[in-house]
Amino acid sequence: MGFLEEVRSYKESQIDTSPEYLRKLEELIEERKEFYDFEKALTSCGTKIIAEVKKASPSEGNIKEVNPEEQAKLYEKAGAIAISVLTDEKYFKGSLEDLRNVRESVKLPLLRKDFTVHKVQILEAKAYGADIVLLIVRMLSDKELKELLDFSEELGLSPLVEVFTLDEAKRALDAGAKIIGINNRDLETFKVDINKTKELAPKIKDLGAKFVISESGISKREEILELMNYQVDGFLIGTSLMKSENPYRKLKELLGF
């Protein structure tokens, strides 16, 4: 069994569709007052970075124990356009509580970073404060991708649709995706190569994507400047910020300040 198959099986086993839980989510959604526009943030001036709060990962193991709210506040102060919060507990040591706590701490669009395989997870994302949800094409059938993408938009959330190949990008765009994330990390081997973005970004823009985000493996300002030449609109950066002794200064450096 490959890594994504293992993850999918685990995620499906964790889905709670009980009437009581769905009512709880509906109540939390009704109570939510603040929403932030990710697409608008992607049209702002300057380098656009989605900064990630990530305590661990399958490729890195434990990275750093941090207070998610404090880390997110540093990112906001430094100039991130959005914050990505890992909510997966098993592989990334995250939680929905981390998402809720970050929501109460910053006034930026929030991405629920998780392996989304069911509509309940999208309800959770909205209930706990996300404005953006991650959909990984490689994990989903065409039917599932379309249903989850449409459901996200019906709830007023922005789907960030992640791809690793041009065929996956075509599937995403056929399903109606506007924001495509190119993962420079192969989720089966965990190998990282930012040339993946150089290879795919111009082609994906030519196919009609509104925005293209480069994800994973970016740690230097020079890499960002280089990738900007390939029609990249934004960058999702986690590990290099989490490993930094001064994440505020590191993010400023990546932004060009």
Swiss-Prot record:
Q: Which processes are annotated in GO (biological process)?
A: L-tryptophan biosynthetic process
Q: Which residues cross the membrane?
A: none
Its UniProt entry gives the catalysed reaction(s) as: 1-(2-carboxyphenylamino)-1-deoxy-D-ribulose 5-phosphate + H(+) = (1S,2R)-1-C-(indol-3-yl)glycerol 3-phosphate + CO2 + H2O
- Give this protein's Gene Ontology molecular function annotations: indole-3-glycerol-phosphate synthase activity; phosphoribosylanthranilate isomerase activity
Keyword Nucleus appears in the UniProt entry: no
Pathways per UniProt: Amino-acid biosynthesis; L-tryptophan biosynthesis; L-tryptophan from chorismate: step 4/5
**CDD domains registered for this protein in UniProt:** IGPS
InterPro entries recorded: Aldolase_TIM, Indole-3-glycerol_P_synth, Indole-3-glycerol_P_synth_dom, Indole-3-GlycerolPSynthase_CS, RibuloseP-bd_barrel
EC number(s) for this protein? 4.1.1.48
Keyword field: Amino-acid biosynthesis, Aromatic amino acid biosynthesis, Decarboxylase, Lyase, Tryptophan biosynthesis
Family, as annotated: Belongs to the TrpC family.
The name this protein carries in UniProt is Indole-3-glycerol phosphate synthase
Q: What is the lineage of its organism?
A: Bacteria, Pseudomonadati, Aquificota, Aquificia, Aquificales
